[in-house]
């Protein structure tokens, strides 16, 4: 699919990326689109929550650790709390896999977040093929 044609390349998995920096978000989005991932970009916790409630096709959340209006862990705990409150057939929020992207490569921090339930902790610079492999593990 050519960019000039106006057509969108077919995608197979829809991911939400809650990002802190525009430049890295667009680079990651372009790389993921080449591998048939639709990466929805949002830049705040508030916007992420809105998208998650509205879009039932989102399969996984990628989230920068530090955001303009809070942290990835605040979003993670909010989503888990809301999902746990609804024990019904079609809850408003599903327990989506949650990945944290960060420059902090402290093993103790990674252990703490994984212990709390975060599915993956990826340090910068992001290795795109490795990220895709990890994402596919959770969405396929």
What are these regions (language model features)?
Residues 63-66, 102:
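Active-site residues of response regulator receiver
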Residues 41-60:
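Acidic, metal-coordinating helix/loop segments flanking the phosphotransfer/catalytic sites
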Residues 123-125:
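A Lys-centered signature of the CheY-like receiver
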Residues 73-74, 94, 102-120:
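Alpha4 helix (beta4-alpha4-beta5 surface) of REC/receiver domains from two-component response regulators
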Residues 41, 67-70:
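Residue-level signal for the "D+5" position in two-component response regulator receiver
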Residues 47, 68, 104-108:
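Negatively charged, flexible loop motifs adjacent to catalytic sites
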Residues 1-31, 35, 46, 77, ...:
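Non-catalytic signal-transmission and effector/linker regions of two-component phosphorelay proteins
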């Amino acid at each position: 699919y050519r960019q000039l044609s106006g057509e969108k390349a077919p995608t197979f998995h829809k991911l939400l990326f809650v990002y802190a920096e525009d430049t890295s978000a667009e680079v990651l989005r372009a790389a993921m689109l080449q591998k048939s991932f639709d990466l929805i970009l949002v830049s705040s916790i508030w916007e992420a929550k809105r998208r998650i409630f509205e879009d039932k096709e989102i399969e996984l959340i990628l989230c920068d650790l530090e955001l303009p209006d809070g942290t990835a862990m605040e979003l993670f705990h909010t989503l888990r709390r809301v999902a746990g409150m609804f024990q019904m057939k079609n809850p408003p929020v599903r327990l989506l896999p949650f990945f944290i992207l960060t420059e902090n490569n402290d093993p103790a921090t990674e252990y703490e977040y994984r212990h709390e339930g975060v599915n993956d902790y990826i340090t910068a610079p992001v290795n795109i093929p490795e990220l895709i492999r990890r994402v596919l593990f959770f969405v396929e």
